[in-house]
Amino acid sequence: MVGIPGVGKSTLLTTMVEILKNHKKNVIVINYGSLMFDVATKNGLKDRDDLRKLSVSEQQRLQKLAAETIATHNEEIVIIDTHAFINSPEGYYPGLPEHVLKIIKPSNFVSVSAKPEEIYNRRMKDDTRNRDKITLANI
């Protein structure tokens, strides 16, 4: 499941998982950025939101390691929560580039969208993350 930051992916996933579990499905949600951060902390990264500030080559390396971990999961339903694009110092980079898709081999792809005003308001209220400031016009 992909979407831009603040679109509501994680909130939607909470409801989806509850419904799936009520239907006796074995489901796991993996936040791709959190998995990448787990690996990056071993190399000294302190803030999850600094992942996007790494070079694209380092992001690619972390994405590959995270994808290899995801590919080992054997739950009936594995849902990946990630961003469609990451705003990096080298420009926008896909959250699920081709080299990752070849490893995880997804069977479905869901893109979440919302009105820019809703996204902006969610981002402004979220004090749990160290997000880059953005204007409504840029969303």
Please report, for each region that a protein language model flagged, where it lies by residue.
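ATP-binding Walker
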Residues: V7
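Walker A/P-loop
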Residues: S10
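Hydrophobic anchor at the beta1->P-loop junction of P-loop NTPases
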Residues: M1
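ATP-dependent small-molecule kinase phosphotransfer cores
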Residues: I28, Y32-P94
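P-loop (Walker A) phosphate-binding loop of NTP-binding proteins
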Residues: I4
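ATP-dependent NMP and nucleoside kinases share a basic, alpha-helical "lid"
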Residues: T82-D126
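Small-molecule kinase domains that catalyze NTP-dependent phosphoryl transfer to phosphate-bearing small molecules
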Residues: M124-I139
